[in-house]
């Protein structure tokens, strides 16, 4: 680089100039020194010196740069060296692992190859494949931690130098390090700290509990106790268990008897709390408390040698507490002695031997059953749970004091039992017997929402209660927060205690009691029960003195439990007859003497809330026996049946010689269905307004398990239909097999929804709705819940599912008739159910009181997928709506559909006649029963008349859409079949989808006529198709006069009995399935008279296919199913005296498809001209062309073609056709129809030519059919009020009915129809003067 531009200085000269100069002068000689001095003086450096300085400076700079570069290179190569070393080490480790794998792999391969089956490798962990091999880890992974983790260890500081403290420790060297590195040291320290905290917490909790109880006494209206409160009451439990020990833990309904829930220490600390309780009078409470507190400690062992142990879930409240009232008195009306005894029993049940940790989880024993506050403990698997270490630190002095107090309570209880229970009417003071009704109602109202959040409890064990014993009353008396009241007649005929109408006993779950006659072997037998199964109690309560105690039996079924207890008045026919006196004297609760006869118990589990209260005021009609129809519904929860996967519930319905009835179980998913009860005697049922029709008085009633229907409803707001369709839980659980002649049923196995059974309620019974104020009569309850008095017989025959008829049981075999425990047994597991609505039940109830008597007989065989539907699954909204609706008693509501079970239809005509209720268009179902009078059946089992009442369509002037049929006929009937707007009667409500949304489609129908078609139906006018395709033949739902739909009285339909039509529906108040025979139409165009008894398993009729509720079957699926189901099994019923089928006539023009408006004008024409036309046309066969034969005959299936041969028409008079019967059903013939048919024949003869007609209709087929399709909405509206019945004129008949006038919408449609008729007439040249419509 050029150095000229820079000032280059002498590096050496930068030093001291003098020194440098002096040194230079000395070194260079005198001459040189002179020159240098001269140059310095001159200010100019010598050039040579400058060059030397520049060279030295550059060399120094280069050397400095090289030194920096070398230092940087050293750093780089050092890092590279480290990476190389690390990579080499890892490579060596990988090589080592590979060698280890190569050594271990052969053994693994050998172990795998030795396996014979390799499918289990998918389900079995790999470690189990070769469990015998050595478990070596890290074959594929390095055992070293990652570097970032190792760095954290390397960077951390060294462990504390605890070894420095060893010289101060007596343990020697390493003691300190070992002590502080031992985990047990920290565990011990933690336990000590926790124990201190727990002790403080217990003391604080106890004080808070006392304060809380005091405030709860001051607040008379409190709800269910919280789990924290209940756990706080478990500080002192007992050390052992007895089977029948009962501990009453729940406070009273309105918080007035709190002493049951308080320990004795709490009583001592705050005796004023006891004085506030309504259980004692003031003096009795204080004196009793003082007597208890002034005693000395003693320990009283239990009679079986064990100290009592309060169960872990002693205070775990059930979902639905229930109060049982004796003879019309509520639980709050109890005398002081009764409640005092309950207090004593409660205080005696507590023992301070165990102190409970409040924070510990309280688990539930699988062998104990908790029904509200009654705890029945089994001795097996009894152990103390959740005992914390501090439980052992209880003060011994306090334990002795509490035990001594409990002993005194036991003694005092015995004194009270002997003195007080025999004098129910004696009360210490007047105020103690006072019941604040307002407080009770308010407390029930406030605690109602808490029913949804109650804790899960255990069901009831299989124990029987011996009601006549005195100790029973003492043991079962308690009060429950938000319980309903169930009333039982007094049942103390043979006991030392006289009947006390004002005394009450609380049956929270009808638990077993310490009856004195229960011996120790019986208790030990219960204790030895190895199965922790949940059993349902059968409370055998022989009842007498019903005249003295006409108290109603009220059941208010709470959130999610429902038990049914029926109290029959006599023993079973199939069981050993036991007189009432002996039955009452017998120790019913012992397993050796179990009787299904005197009483029965039906546990049922609804899914949603249902309030069913039946009140029997006719108890005075039956002296010495249980009032008929008394039923007790005990609420029960579905999800608490059992802890086992298949919940097992046992109901003690067994024969007298059956000793294992307490362990009979039924596997169900929440269903227990056992109901054996006796119906009323014949005379009593007549007094109650029930039509018995010769039913034996001892005919039992049984209720089988059904699946409930989950109802979605908008509570009938604004008159709308339900917002969501019902969800049908159709389950196919096997039914029970009942041994013939044996009274112990093997209960059904089902996972379906529960049911509610009532056994013969009377008209005077009342129903109390939770949120309503209006009682409902029990006849409505019977229909609401599906009360079907009678016996559902069990049948061993295939495809036979029977329901008891008035005087016989169909399909019942081997003498099981009358066995109240005989259940319906069918190979098809299910019974046909029906769906109805509340308004229909209310309407039909009114007509039932008019004396309409009918019975239900099931000709339908068992269906695989048909479930009974229960009315117990109402939501809370539905209940409120039900209460409000029933208050108004308006029979016009059709908004809230519900399900009614059709199980046993007995002689209770007053109640059962209302089960045949009318259905809304979206509620129509197949009802598998025909309602008939047995003495009036004809040869085909058809009743001569069935009069029903209370039309569901009383507000409408037209039949529902399901009862109508619209036929769309193309103009060219030779090339295509007619189209019917059909509701698929073959599949009518055999699917849950049809129940949800009845759909209609345009169904292609054949034009092949049947049996002397002549002109028998309206189809003769529209297409000359088969004569029996009209809906007048299917069922007489279509009448020409729409005023029939406005009739609400059953007597108004007697005028139509002249037609002698068994299928006539009075006010159309019954579903179409109530007819015995269904005339079906399939795709072949043939009418099928289907009897329910002719249907097989594969038929679609009555089968409720369990698709999902949201899936609506399409048209193809329905029709395919209909063809497969009905064509092979529904042959056409042919009369032997009728001739073969005539060829079909040609399709008439559109001008003949006139409306009813024209009929009123042309009706007045002379009948003489029409008679002449009839005479001239009756001998001529209808016109038939090969073209029509070619297109219409192949439509019929092969099996129907054999039944529909083409033959010459019947040449006899048409009067014979009008009077003939189809399978015993006489066809209704309208005189106007006959006249129109005659005119129709005349018009057909006057046609110029068949080919011309065919050509015109062929050219206009598409256009007219499309037009009809576009107008179907108007036609549907018209057909709701009008019916097309074009028939042939009959000279022997006179016009007895006048057509109704059409409304404005119909007039508009008629004008369009007339325009079409005129257009067709102008083309065809035909005359329509001789045509009219009906």
UniProtKB/Swiss-Prot annotation:
Alphabetical UniProt keywords: Actin-binding, Cytoplasm, Cytoskeleton
UniProt biased composition (Low complexity): 310-319, 945-956, 1289-1304
Domain named WH2: residues: 1271-1289
Subcellular location: Cytoplasm, Cytoskeleton
Annotated GO CC locations: cytoplasm; cytoskeleton
Domain of life of the native organism: Eukaryota
Gene Ontology biological process terms in this record: actin cytoskeleton organization; positive regulation of Arp2/3 complex-mediated actin nucleation
Region called Disordered, residue ranges: 197-281, 294-331, 481-516, 568-602, 643-668, 791-832, 931-956, 1000-1026, 1248-1268, 1280-1304
Single Gene Ontology MF annotation: actin binding
Annotated Basic and acidic residues bias: 197-207, 574-595, 1248-1260
Composition-biased stretches (Polar residues): 241-256, 320-330, 791-823
Family according to the record: Belongs to the SCAR/WAVE family.
Functional summary from the UniProt entry: Involved in regulation of actin and microtubule organization. Part of a WAVE complex that activates the Arp2/3 complex.
Protein name, per record: SCAR-like protein 2
UniProt organism field: Oryza sativa subsp. japonica
